[in-house]
Amino acid sequence: MKSDHDIYLFREGTHAKLYNKLGCHLQSNGGANFAVWAPNAESVSVVGDWNYWSGNVDRLDLRDDGSGIWQGFVENAVRGQGYKYRIQSSHGSYGVDKADPFAFYAEPPPATASRVWSLEHDWKDDQWMSSRGPKNALDAPMSIYEIHLGSWRRQDGHFLDYRELAHSLADYVIEMGFTHVELMPVTEHPFYGSWGYQTTGYFAPTSRFGTPQDFMHFVDHLHQRGIGVLLDWVPSHFPTDEHGLGYFDGTHLFEHSDPRQGFHPEWNSSIFNYGRNEVRSFLISSGLFWLDKYHLDGLRVDGVASMLYLDYARKEDEWIPNRHGGRENLEAVDFLQTLNKAVYREYPDTLTIAEESTAWPRVSRPTDMDGLGFGMKWNMGWMHDSLAYMQQEPVHRKYHHHKLTFSLVYAFNENFVLPLSHDEVVHGKGSLLGKMPGDAWQQFANLRALFGYMWAHPGKKLLFMGGEFGQRREWTHDGELEWWVTKLEGHAGLQRYVAQLNRVYRSLPALYQLDFSPAGFEWVEADAADTSVFAFLRKPREHGAPVLIVSNMTPVPRTNYMLGVPLAGFWREVINSDASEFGGSGWGNLGGVEASPVRFHGRPHSVCLTLPPLSTLIFEHVPHA
């Protein structure tokens, strides 16, 4: 039952486990308790399959503590039945049937009722859960495979369910060497074409792919196979569907009443009122719910930029300044800080990642340093500049050289994830492979070179499904990926390259331990615009051996290319994007080169390399015995 302390935390905006108190909860001796927040309702009834959807049978009682919570026991409710709250507003004659904001399960869309359900599961991921802290740490290798469950693979045109996906996805992710998967939102959503970003069920995995227990099995199985699971989570807005959160009790309860604050013009959706404490408790509880009940390893928070700015996607007269006259959404800032503090307090071995596309400062810095408190942030600037550079014909790249070097000016201002996400392969943008210039051979070579540069660049890695084998058409949610192309040599070679790149990345601490420290990076050749060559060192902590990375972004092979290196000994070529096995031309350095005692680039030793066309090479230093 809800204690006075629960009510206090709820109204203070700091209750992090409301899902244990509100919503529908089956009782061991039969029946279920129901509770819903509707402070402006005149009456609330539970209508469902057991009472033939009559509003005259199971009426709830309003608590007398001013919380606005209606509650009651329904004797005849059993697991699996559909239900809604029939709300009669105290404002006029407005009445509506609403889905339960705290429902654990819902009917498959287009049906909109909630389902009576419970969340028991015999978890078998103890080994993962007890040891995941180092795997999710900032100094760990992190190569994330972003996936949309409805369009990764299908069976005869139909969705795979959570259990089928668990086994086939785990096999594939292990084969490809990724460390984590990031799921585009699985929170219940009425419109499949929203990809999950128009959420109505903040505590329910979508029933399109099975039950809550099926999704628990999905996470459990991936954990048992050593794969972390991250979830896209959307506290930035919600859809206006009648059964959802909007105008919940005849008033703008979850959203602002003024459309200049409460309506999102770009997404045609409602914006949460982050200044309302009960709404904050709802959202914080939703975020922690997935970490608690589903053992997820982290949240990627969608649309953070839209939350931070009151004038986001608005014309000059379409927004209301904050109390200081500024454009910053102070309530959203405070909410995000409170959310991150709650996550890291309750689940310190998980992580939060912000999708934030502006230069808002200290997104991934602790709240006690006036930061937002996220663990990491997507580096949208790196993504835009890198793709803009790679889309240039190689002959023109010398005029855009800075687009690949500029990211290192700010690379350590935040804890960055480098994303090549679903956003880059939709809405007419084409596929990653399709963005690359040249003939088919050059397109594959360009994409391999980009991936090599990306995996060596400071920051964790994220790649959307299909990019790893060079999907030809841009992504669509209405079918599966073009798996058939992996039988073609160029695509198969790219797929082998990404798998090997992941293995090399995970084996070399220099490529991940100091992702967020300037001590982990050093330019060797930053200004060779005329040759479009880039060379840099990545360094591990504790004086470990550095790794040399060299990219040649033209189709001209270069021989006897001299670069300064800090150490004598053998520099072993651990991966070459132009290797024949990956579909390349086979140029290379025959396994590596010996450093000469010739000073160059201000360093005591140097190497003379063969740089293949459109390639990235990674060299590991091997000291002499």
Curated annotation (Swiss-Prot):
<dbReference type="InterPro" id="IPR037439">
    <property type="entry name" value="Branching_enzy"/>
</dbReference>
<dbReference type="GO" id="GO:0003844">
    <property type="term" value="F:1,4-alpha-glucan branching enzyme activity"/>
</dbReference>
<dbReference type="InterPro" id="IPR044143">
    <property type="entry name" value="GlgB_N_E_set_prok"/>
</dbReference>
<protein>
    <recommendedName>
        <fullName>1,4-alpha-glucan branching enzyme GlgB</fullName>
        <ecNumber>2.4.1.18</ecNumber>
    </recommendedName>
</protein>
<dbReference type="InterPro" id="IPR006048">
    <property type="entry name" value="A-amylase/branching_C"/>
</dbReference>
<dbReference type="GO" id="GO:0043169">
    <property type="term" value="F:cation binding"/>
</dbReference>
<keyword id="KW-0119">Carbohydrate metabolism</keyword>
<dbReference type="Pfam" id="PF00128">
    <property type="entry name" value="Alpha-amylase"/>
</dbReference>
<dbReference type="GO" id="GO:0005829">
    <property type="term" value="C:cytosol"/>
</dbReference>
<dbReference type="InterPro" id="IPR014756">
    <property type="entry name" value="Ig_E-set"/>
</dbReference>
<dbReference type="GO" id="GO:0004553">
    <property type="term" value="F:hydrolase activity, hydrolyzing O-glycosyl compounds"/>
</dbReference>
<comment type="similarity">
    <text>Belongs to the glycosyl hydrolase 13 family. GlgB subfamily.</text>
</comment>
<dbReference type="InterPro" id="IPR006047">
    <property type="entry name" value="Glyco_hydro_13_cat_dom"/>
</dbReference>
<comment type="function">
    <text>Catalyzes the formation of the alpha-1,6-glucosidic linkages in glycogen by scission of a 1,4-alpha-linked oligosaccharide from growing alpha-1,4-glucan chains and the subsequent attachment of the oligosaccharide to the alpha-1,6 position.</text>
</comment>
<comment type="subunit">
    <text>Monomer.</text>
</comment>
<dbReference type="InterPro" id="IPR013780">
    <property type="entry name" value="Glyco_hydro_b"/>
</dbReference>
<feature type="active site" description="Nucleophile">
    <location>
        <position position="302"/>
    </location>
</feature>
<keyword id="KW-0321">Glycogen metabolism</keyword>
<dbReference type="InterPro" id="IPR013783">
    <property type="entry name" value="Ig-like_fold"/>
</dbReference>
<dbReference type="GO" id="GO:0005978">
    <property type="term" value="P:glycogen biosynthetic process"/>
</dbReference>
<keyword id="KW-0328">Glycosyltransferase</keyword>
<dbReference type="InterPro" id="IPR004193">
    <property type="entry name" value="Glyco_hydro_13_N"/>
</dbReference>
<dbReference type="Pfam" id="PF02922">
    <property type="entry name" value="CBM_48"/>
</dbReference>
<keyword id="KW-0808">Transferase</keyword>
<feature type="active site" description="Proton donor">
    <location>
        <position position="355"/>
    </location>
</feature>
<dbReference type="Pfam" id="PF02806">
    <property type="entry name" value="Alpha-amylase_C"/>
</dbReference>
<dbReference type="InterPro" id="IPR006407">
    <property type="entry name" value="GlgB"/>
</dbReference>
<keyword id="KW-0320">Glycogen biosynthesis</keyword>
<dbReference type="InterPro" id="IPR017853">
    <property type="entry name" value="Glycoside_hydrolase_SF"/>
</dbReference>
<comment type="pathway">
    <text>Glycan biosynthesis; glycogen biosynthesis.</text>
</comment>
